[in-house]
Curated annotation (Swiss-Prot):
Name of the featured protein: Large ribosomal subunit protein bL36
HAMAP family in UniProt: Ribosomal_bL36
GO cellular component: cytoplasm; ribonucleoprotein complex; ribosome
Keyword vocabulary terms for this entry: Ribonucleoprotein, Ribosomal protein
Any one GO MF annotation of this record: structural constituent of ribosome
Superkingdom as given in the UniProt entry: Bacteria
């Protein structure tokens, strides 16, 4: 899980979603998981 000020899709399979008011990227590739912090 990377925590960064701006989250972006890295590949085609990345999805930008909102959970508990936080913007997150979920993906099949665990390295692509990101959370806005």
């Amino acid at each position: 899980m990377k925590v960064r000020p701006s989250v972006k899709k890295i590949c085609e399979k990345c999805k930008v979603i909102k959970r508990h008011g936080k913007v997150m990227v979920i993906c099949e590739n665990p390295k692509h998981k990101q959370r806005q912090g």
